[in-house]
Amino acid sequence: MAKKVAAQIKLQLPAGKATPAPPVGPALGQHGVNIMEFCKRFNAETADKAGMILPVVITVYEDKSFTFIIKTPPASFLLKKAAGIESGSSEPKRKIVGKVTRKQIEEIAKIKMPDLNANDLEAAMRIIEGTARSMGIEVVD
């Protein structure tokens, strides 16, 4: 018999640095999950990806046990890293804050492929290019 799902929690956490402080503590605490156990397991699994922000989907079951799936870093995070900028443009399409090459877009698309709703690399690249444009990052050849 499969366990009954009580809740699904989505968080974006720095790799290897989950702590019981907000936002982790309150999000998991209200569902009765052992917060320290989650933090230890998450940090152990993401220790090799230091410096990245990773989305995680935590499934909490009725018996207070949990499982979690770690997704690929957000496209915006990868684009900011590739362009070497702190944050996106305050006025996208008017104010360009950085540049990325097609090669960098392809690399990001390859990393994001498992989480994107795209059939091939071309479609994935177009999705990432759109994200770049909406952040005020210019795509150059």
From Swiss-Prot:
Q: Which UniProt keywords apply?
A: Methylation, Ribonucleoprotein, Ribosomal protein, RNA-binding, rRNA-binding
Changes after translation:
One or more lysine residues are methylated.
InterPro entries according to UniProt: Ribosomal_uL11 (IPR000911), Ribosomal_uL11_bac-typ (IPR006519), Ribosomal_uL11_C (IPR020783), Ribosomal_uL11_C_sf (IPR036769), Ribosomal_uL11_CS (IPR020785), Ribosomal_uL11_N (IPR020784), Ribosomal_uL11_N_sf (IPR036796)
Q: Does the keyword RNA-binding apply?
A: yes
GO molecular function annotations of the record? large ribosomal subunit rRNA binding; structural constituent of ribosome
Tell whether Ribosomal protein is among the UniProt keywords. yes
Q: Which CDD domains match?
A: Ribosomal_L11
Q: What GO cellular component entries does it have?
A: cytosolic large ribosomal subunit
TM ranges are none
**Source taxon at top rank:** Bacteria
Which Gene Ontology terms describe the biological processes this protein takes part in?
translation
NCBIfam families with a match to the protein in the record:
L11_bact
Q: How does it assemble?
A: Part of the ribosomal stalk of the 50S ribosomal subunit. Interacts with L10 and the large rRNA to form the base of the stalk. L10 forms an elongated spine to which L12 dimers bind in a sequential fashion forming a multimeric L10(L12)X complex.
Protein family according to the UniProt entry: Belongs to the universal ribosomal protein uL11 family.
Q: What does this protein do?
A: Forms part of the ribosomal stalk which helps the ribosome interact with GTP-bound translation factors.
HAMAP family, alphabetized: Ribosomal_uL11 (MF_00736)
Q: What protein is this chain from?
A: Large ribosomal subunit protein uL11
Q: Which organism is it from?
A: Thermotoga neapolitana (strain ATCC 49049 / DSM 4359 / NBRC 107923 / NS-E)
